[in-house]
């Protein structure tokens, strides 16, 4: 989806829409591509100042090489000074320890309508987890970590938020900022 920085807030149906909009404005990005809905609909060509990846569309890619290839495929759409900003799925060490126990890690979200979404996270090794939502069949995902091969190979910078604060390994957020090709 192509948007100007003004349109970014309307695109996001998230609590942090203002934060993503502020990022686009701070970077003075005129051409913005939002890939938060997935990597399947990537355009064949284009040159974007900013590509935003909220909701980690890379989380389902479990292999190092495949993840690096997916990042390279997205990077080809960046302008020379453009940035790819990934809100990476991150599991801090204290939550990984709980997910590694037989009972796993339970996360619950309550919605305005009173419904509750319950996720059971089970660590399976190498930063991979099986997630069961409300008793559904498991989905396998891979969380990011600071030593991630795909990030290192792409020259990414790791931050703790869209405001570029330092990454805190005990915190709950990992933002990867991948530069365009130079």
Residue ranges of each PLM-predicted region?
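Conserved class I S-adenosyl-L-methionine
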Residues: 1-38
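A short acidic, Gly/Pro-enriched loop at the edge of an enzyme's catalytic core
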Residues: 42-51
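A short beta-strand submotif of the Rossmann-like class I SAM-dependent methyltransferase core
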Residues: 53-57
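A short His-aromatic
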Residues: 59-61
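A short glycine-rich, Lys/Arg-flanked "PGG" loop and its adjoining helix->strand segment in the class I
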Residues: 66-83
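SAM-dependent methyltransferase
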Residues: 87-149
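C-terminal lobe and adjacent flexible extensions of AdoMet/dcAdoMet transferase-like proteins
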Residues: 144-182
